Amino acid sequence: MVVHVDPEARGDERGALLAFLDAERGGIRRALLGLSDQAAATRPSASELSLSGLLKHVRLTEQSWLERATGTAAEPAEGGTYADQEHGYELVGEETVASELAAWEAAARRTEEFIRAADTLDATFALPDAPWFPPGQRVSLRWLLLRLITEMARHAGHADIIRESLDGAVAFELVAKERGRSGGSRRGG
């Protein structure tokens, strides 16, 4: 991890989990630092992934898990499949990197408010009815946070590779840039 996550106050499990979640979000946000919408949409490898596509995907992912946990999720369309999520990896219409970042920031704020207001991280909600989940299974809010952390971490790694492929910028340099510092070691040493 490129940035330090401060230790939680003794016994503050939810604070620690939220801090690590936000640190992983930061890796994705920083990968977009200084890029135009056009550059962020570039796919510099054989992969279909772009930075703007990853941004939209993680925003939709966090938003949909929060809706599921709060009981406000809309039911999927009849016959919906994983392939229906194709536009979840690209900006369409009037969507921009700035609008997706703002929407993601709002989703992140709602996630934190919901988790902090919960009586316990042991509270559960039902997993969606989807072929990749066991039918009828319930998971805890703790599971939700761990799921979001792993999702963000996976895509922060993708974002690091995509950004370096675009212009050579690496995470340590982007942290320095974000903090208004010059340089930043390519290897963090």
Task: List each language-model region with its residue ranges.
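Short, contiguous alpha-helical
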Residues: V2-E8, R14-L33, D37-H87, L127-G189
